[in-house]
UniProtKB/Swiss-Prot annotation:
Pathway: Lipid metabolism; fatty acid biosynthesis. GO terms for cellular component: cytosol; membrane. GO terms for biological process: lipid A biosynthetic process. GO terms for molecular function: acyl binding; acyl carrier activity; phosphopantetheine binding. 4'-phosphopantetheine is transferred from CoA to a specific serine of apo-ACP by AcpS. This modification is essential for activity because fatty acids are bound in thioester linkage to the sulfhydryl of the prosthetic group. This is Acyl carrier protein. Pfam families: PP-binding (PF00550). It is found in: Cytoplasm. Keywords: Cytoplasm, Fatty acid biosynthesis, Fatty acid metabolism, Lipid biosynthesis, Lipid metabolism, Phosphopantetheine, Phosphoprotein. The keyword Protease does not apply. The modification O-(pantetheine 4'-phosphoryl)serine is found at residue 36.
Amino acid sequence: MSIEERVKKIIVDQLGVKAEDVKPEASFIEDLGADSLDTVELVMALEEEFDIEIPDEEAEKITTVQSAIDYVAKANA
């Protein structure tokens, strides 16, 4: 599975949304119905899946599907 596929799977699992709704431009809060707790849990799941640490100031910038994919890809580069 690619990084993009793994990130999307985590989003589907964490937020309970349909895979077809997880588009690159989708906002976790506005488009996928997440709240602040959901976004914290999502960041923790990304950290665990990819064995990375995402500082709070960086986590605040991860607001869309694409921003999560980009961050993880950069962290794994």
